[in-house]
Amino acid sequence: MASEIHMLQPMCLIENTEAHLVINQEALRILSAINQPVVVVAIVGLYRTGKSYLMNKLAGKRTGFSLGSTVQSHTKGIWMWCVPHPKKAGQTLVLLDTEGLEDVEKGDNQNDCWIFALAVLLSSTFVYNSMGTINQQAMDQLHYVTELTDLIKSKSSPDQSGIDDSANFVGFFPTFVWALRDFSLELEVNGKLVTPDEYLEHSLTLKKGADKKTKSFNEPRLCIRKFFPKRKCFIFDRPALRKQLCKLETLGEEELCSEFVEQVAEFTSYIFSYSAVKTLSGGIIVNGPRLKSLVQTYVGAISSGSLPCMESAVLTLAQIENSAAVQKAITHYEEQMNQKIQMPTETLQELLDLHRLIEREAIEIFLKNSFKDVDQKFQTELGNLLISKRDAFIKKNSDVSSAHCSDLIEDIFGPLEEEVKQGTFSKPGGYFLFLQMRQELEKKYNQAPGKGLEAEAVLKKYFESKEDIVETLLKTDQSLTEAAKEIEVERIKAETAEAANRELAEKQEKFELMMQQKEESYQEHVRQLTEKMKEEQKKLIEEQDNIIALKLREQEKFLREGYENESKKLLREIENMKRRQSPGKCTIL
C-alpha cells in the first residue's frame, strides 16, 4: 500500500533567511516518504490577510499554520503541511502557506517574487488571498503575475517558431483561485447580481487604448487570463468583530459570522473536490519524491542565479527516476533468473527461453517506472545490461556444467586410471581391453542425468588429456601387428576429426541461437516501447487538446470584447501547438 503521512503540524519547507532561500532537509525527507499522488494547494497574498486561517481549515485543524494576528506577521518562506486527502483515498494533500508579500517589516522584499513564482510552480491549485474588492489597487498588488515571464522559463531553449516562451505556461500552471476576504459589497455588475466567478471575469475585462495608464491597467489582467485559463473566485465576509479577530483560531463556529462559516465550507469543499493531483507535462503524476525533486531543482536554479525552467526540472527528475527504473528492472531480472533457473540446463535454448520471459518482465518494469527517456538513452542502457547479465548466466551455467562433469568423470573414470597405473593393460591384448572398459564407462557417463551442455566438451577434453596413455598402450601391445596399429591410428584420427566437426556445428548452432535471441530481444524492446509511445502520444494529444480548448475560449472572449491583437496572438499560439502534435520517433539500441 502507498504510504500515508500524518504530520501533526506544519514544517518550514523553504526558509527565506537573509535574502536567501534555504530548503529544510527534514521537510524533504517527509516528501521522500510520500509515495501517493499529491494534491498541492499553495496560498499567496499580502501579509496579515488571513491566509493561514484558510489553510488550517483545509488541514481540518483550528491551529497549525501561524495566524500572525498581531501586528507582526509570522510565516517566513514557504511552510508545508502534508495530510491524508479528506475526500480522495490514496492521495495526499500538501498545503503550502507562504509568507506575506510586501511586509514592511522585512525591509527587503526581493524574495517576494521568488516566493510567488515557487508557489505557482509547485502547486496544482494556486490561491491568491486579498482583502476587499478586486479594484485597481488589488491588481497593482498582484504585480507579481506580470513578472512571471522574467522569473520562469517553460523551455530550456527558444521556440523555433518564434512563439513567446510564456505561451507554454498554460500547460504547467495551476488552477487560479482568488479568495476575497472581508468582502462587504453586493456582488453586482451594472446593477445585475452576479456570482463570484462572474465578478472575477468582469474584473479581468481589459480597457481599450495604448497609453501607459491603460497598459498598466491591462497588463496584470492580461497575464491572469493568458497564464491561468482555469479560474475560480470565492468571497468571504468578515469572520467576526474586530476585537475578536486576534483570537480567531480559538473561536467556535457558533461565535463566527454564519455567512463566513458557510463561505469557508464552500471554499474547502471546492478545494477537496476539484483540486487536481499535481501533474507534469505528458500527464506525469507527481508524488512526494517527485515534488521533492522539483523543490530542489527550482530553488537550486534560483540560488545559482538562473531562472527556474519547467522543462529542465522535468528532465532532471526523469534522469533520477529513469536511472532508478533501470536498476529496478535489472534487480528483478537477476532475482527471477536466480530463482527459476535450474543449473546446469541441458541446452542453451532452455536458458534463453527463460531469459526471454524474464527480459520481457524487466522491460515492462522499466517502461512503467520511466518517462521522458530522451533518445531512449536509459532503455539502451537497460538493453546492454540485460545482455551482460544474460551472458553472465550463460557463463555460470557452463561453469556449473563443467564442474559437475569433471567431478562425474573423476568418479567414473578414476578406477580405470588406477588399473592403468597398476599395469592391468600392459600385456598382449591389453589395448583393446582398455578400449572396451573405457567405452563402457563412457556409456555410463553419457547416461548420467543433469550434466548440462558442457558434457561432451568436458569428456573430449578429458580424453585428449589421456591421449599419451592410449598411444603408449597401442604401441606396446605385442599382440597387434604394425598394420593393425596403423589402422587403429587412422580410426582415432577419424574419430577426432568427427568430434571436431561436431564441435564446429555446435558453435555454429550457438551463434545462430544467440543471433536469433538478439533479434527477439530487439523486437521486444521495440514492441513495448512503441506501445508506451502510443499511449504517451495519446495522453499528450489529450493534454494539448485541453490546453487548446482553454486558449480558444480565451481567444474567442478577446474577439468578442474587441481586442483583435490579443485574439490573433492566441490564435498563433494555438496553430503552433497543433503543428507540434506529431508522434515521436522510436530509435533504440
Curated annotation (Swiss-Prot):
Its EC number is 3.6.5.-. Residues 35-276 form the GB1/RHD3-type G domain. Widely expressed. GTP binds at G45, L46, Y47, R48, T49, G50, K51, S52, R181, D182, L245. PROSITE patterns: G_GB1_RHD3. It is a lipid-anchor. It is an enzyme of class 3 (hydrolase). Belongs to the TRAFAC class dynamin-like GTPase superfamily. GB1/RHD3 GTPase family. GB1 subfamily. This is Guanylate-binding protein 2. It comes from Rattus norvegicus. The gene is Gbp2.
